[in-house]
């Protein structure tokens, strides 16, 4: 536990490390913060926080991810007021790259300095490793990141539609269902190193237990991988020209699994994937 702080509420706040036992509490902070953000952005779609049944379904779907992040985090900090968790932040390190996975503060406590305090704990100023994050467009949060030298590189949009069973797209790719084997993880990690310049084997071991993984080969050599499930992705391909064939296959697999929704987050710099998705009736969420 570390020193306490006092917000504009004149209520004492203490900061303490988090653990897997705090997963549900931080899930609720995220859901309430996200609902507030969507309201401020003018989005009218209902969020799960107002519907106990929907909230329970969302927690059931995401609990494994929260537990995985808690188990593999490098820094995980909570802001507490009494027994209530009012904010949290977490970062992971993968092969020398630090990723800020979450930074969320309850609406009533935003702009009180809690975000800055939490960020300082999970992104140490003296650290020299490479850093990145996937951030919302919330301007106060953006200001925090910019002050720490984290600058936007590109936007990421969520594309989705009801999946269709599609004819196989003409391609010389061979598609193989991946098993949770050391060999498959090694292949995926090698491709991560080649394209992303770091490995994330611990995440592949979790992903392949949650979703159906696929390896893509050309002339006997691995050229990519992807995951399809209740949540799909990530997809990594050494040649972006393969995205139409891979996404056609992935959508068909989602339909074959009986899913009513197929969606994935796509960096808009991936023009081949974006063009394919838009030309095939996918919708965009902010």
Task: Show where each model-derived region lies.
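Conserved GNAT acetyl-CoA-binding A-motif
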Residues: 98-101, 125-138, 257-267
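Active-site/acyl-donor-binding loops of N-acyltransferases
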Residues: 2, 136-137, 143, 148-168, ...
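Conserved beta-strand in the GNAT
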Residues: 76-78, 83-92, 99-104, 215, ...
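Active-site rim helix/loop that mediates acceptor-substrate recognition in acyltransferases
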Residues: 30-76, 80-82, 193-213
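A short beta-loop-alpha structural element at the N-terminal edge
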Residues: 14-28, 35-39, 173-188
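Flexible loop/N-cap segments at domain edges
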Residues: 210-216, 223-266
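Conserved acetyl-CoA-binding loop-helix of GNAT-fold acetyltransferases
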Residues: 102-105, 111-124, 142-147, 241-253
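Amide-forming acyltransferase catalytic core, primarily the GNAT-like/NAT-type
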Residues: 128, 147-231, 246
């Amino acid at each position: 536990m570390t020193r306490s702080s006092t917000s504009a509420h004149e209520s004492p706040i203490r900061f303490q490390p988090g653990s897997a036992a705090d997963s549900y509490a931080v899930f609720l902070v995220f859901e309430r913060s996200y609902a507030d953000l969507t309201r401020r952005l003018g989005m009218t779609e209902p969020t799960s926080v107002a519907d106990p049944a929907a909230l329970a379904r969302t927690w059931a779907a995401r609990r494994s991810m929260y537990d995985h992040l808690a188990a593999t985090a490098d820094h995980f900090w909570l802001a507490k007021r009494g027994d209530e968790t009012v904010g949290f932040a977490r970062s992971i390190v993968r092969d020398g790259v630090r990723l800020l996975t979450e930074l969320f503060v309850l609406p009533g406590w935003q702009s009180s300095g809690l975000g800055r305090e939490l960020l300082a704990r999970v992104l140490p100023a003296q650290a020299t490793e490479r850093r990145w994050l996937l951030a919302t467009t919330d301007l106060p949060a953006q200001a925090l990141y910019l002050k720490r030298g984290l600058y936007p590189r590109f936007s990421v949009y969520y594309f989705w539609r009801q999946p269709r069973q599609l004819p196989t797209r003409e391609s010389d790719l061979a598609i193989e269902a991946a098993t949770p084997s050391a060999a498959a993880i090694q292949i995926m990690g090698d491709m991560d190193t080649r394209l992303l310049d770091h490995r994330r084997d611990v995440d592949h071991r979790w992903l392949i237990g949650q979703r159906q993984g696929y390896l893509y080969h050309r002339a006997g050599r691995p050229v990519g991988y992807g995951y399809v499930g209740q949540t799909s992705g990530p997809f990594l391909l050494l040649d972006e020209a393969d995205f139409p064939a891979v996404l056609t296959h992935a959508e068909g697999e989602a339909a074959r699994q009986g899913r009513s929704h197929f969606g994935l987050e796509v960096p808009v710099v991936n023009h081949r994937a974006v063009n394919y998705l838009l030309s095939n009736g996918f919708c965009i969420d902010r």
